[in-house]
Amino acid sequence: MHTGQIIQLLAGFYDVLTEDHKIVRTRARGNFRNQKTSPLVGDMVDFKESENDTGYITKIHTRENELVRPPLANIDQAVIVTAATEPSFSANLLDRQLVALAEKHIEAILYFSKTDLLSPTEFQDLQKIAGYYQKIGYQVIFPISSQPDADLIELKESFKNQLTIFMGQTGAGKSTLLNRIDSKLNIATGEVSQALNRGKHTTRKVSLIPIEDGLVADTPGFSTYAVFEMADTQLKEYFIDFKKLSQNCRFRECLHLNEPGCAVKAAVEDGSVLSSRYANYEQFIELIRNQKPEYKRKGYQKKDRRKKK
């Protein structure tokens, strides 16, 4: 019996990286279908090797976390590639991504791409926004043309012993950035459609690539997230700046909406919290509250209303 981590799924085969850095091509046993589960890229698995050089996965280890889109497991950190322009910067999308990652216990690294395309005024405005996210505790990489390699050095230092994903709005430059990190990757890139201001999807498969003593996934770009599957009372826990300030709220269960003595609202009013952060928080609360019930819960079975013969 051997143990390793799935680094690629392609045409029904799972490539597993072993502890001695050997890659073994495997298939999943049929019993996983009976368990209503299947291996994901990033899974730690046990497998048996066979004589025809194709192994068989026998066990999937307990996952630390997982994403549905893209289908990945055991992610340590995510580099959110946020376009400064083309497509336009979206604080709403960035905050959605940060909440989604925090809910999955995935550390976030903010990378602002295409900063060289901004005017001096636009550059300064976005740099202030980036500075706020850095101040509240996020690792932020904001490329400066006078220091062309500083961003890559900082990124590479963060990869060691981590499973890292790259995510962000379509056309933000995830694949372009990975090509800069390691030219041998030769990942396809696409231009942004001028008509739709949306990038063409260029990444076709889910795989993990060994880089700087870590594993990096290049994942399909996407620009929206489903409504968060959480109670409205939970959302405040994933706004790290709000969480720190809430200790000074008059009420312990303050939702930072209409309650008197709210430290978060006071911070928004005096400018120490970005107004866009609070506006996004209010919008996300409404999205959660207006979410339709999910009836396909575990254990739920639709009644058969057909008449028995």
Curated annotation (Swiss-Prot):
GO molecular-function term, one example from the UniProt record: metal ion binding
Cofactor: Zn(2+)
A GO CC term assigned to this protein in UniProt: cytoplasm
Keywords: Cytoplasm, GTP-binding, Hydrolase, Metal-binding, Nucleotide-binding, Ribosome biogenesis, RNA-binding, rRNA-binding, Zinc
InterPro entries for the chain: G_CP_dom, NA-bd_OB-fold, P-loop_NTPase, Ribosome_biogen_GTPase_RsgA, RsgA_GTPase_dom, RsgA_N
Compartment list: Cytoplasm
PROSITE patterns per record: ENGC_GTPASE, G_CP
Principal EC category: hydrolase
SUPFAM superfamilies documented for this protein: Nucleic acid-binding proteins (SSF50249), P-loop containing nucleoside triphosphate hydrolases (SSF52540)
CDD domains in the record: S1_YloQ_GTPase, YjeQ_EngC
Binding site for GTP: S113, K114, T115, D116, G168, Q169, T170, G171, A172, G173, K174, S175, T176
Cofactor binding note: Binds 1 zinc ion per subunit.
Gene Ontology biological process: ribosomal small subunit biogenesis
Subunit structure: Monomer. Associates with 30S ribosomal subunit, binds 16S rRNA.
Name this polypeptide is given: Small ribosomal subunit biogenesis GTPase RsgA
The gene coding this protein: rsgA
